[in-house]
Amino acid sequence: MKRILIVDDEPVVIGVLRAFFAEFQHGHTYELTTASSANDAFILLLQEQFDLILLDIVLPVIDYWHVQQAAGLDLLKRVRDLGVTAPVLMMTGGDGGTPREVEALIEGAFGYLHKPFDLSELDHLVTLALGPRAASG
């Protein structure tokens, strides 16, 4: 069983990804965990291990007084600082090649996906990200 963490603040995106993993199993079983904020995801990553992380590039960060928009890049950096080695696929509403996407790759993201998703591209990147490990589970 492959454990996947989906981090996105849009319920529709989480729903699409849940449907995708139910449909495109390739004989594998996936356990999906979701988080709607960088804070929630960080806590999960401290407590659990995942085989793949799908991370929105822009997520809300809640401080004690208001909600700020903070790049998922910050979470990506914190994840790598924790020593988490799971591949991270960044998700973005951008049209490709933006500075944030380039920075995500520099910071160690495995790749990125554009919303709305091309399901064949999503399938291909998930298969590549899970690599040889996907064949065993």
Where are these regions (language model features)?
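C-terminal output helix
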Residues: 105, 117-126
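Acidic, metal-coordinating helix/loop segments flanking the phosphotransfer/catalytic sites
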Residues: 33-52, 56, 60-62, 81
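Short amphipathic alpha-helix used as the core "switch/output" element in two-component signaling
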Residues: 43, 62-84
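Conserved phosphotransfer cores of two-component systems
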Residues: 24, 46-48, 78-85, 107
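Alpha4 helix (beta4-alpha4-beta5 surface) of REC/receiver domains from two-component response regulators
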Residues: 66-70, 74, 95-111
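Two-component/phosphorelay signaling modules centered on CheY-like receiver
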Residues: 11-33
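Hydrophobic/aromatic residues positioned on beta-strands within the core alpha/beta folds
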Residues: 91-92
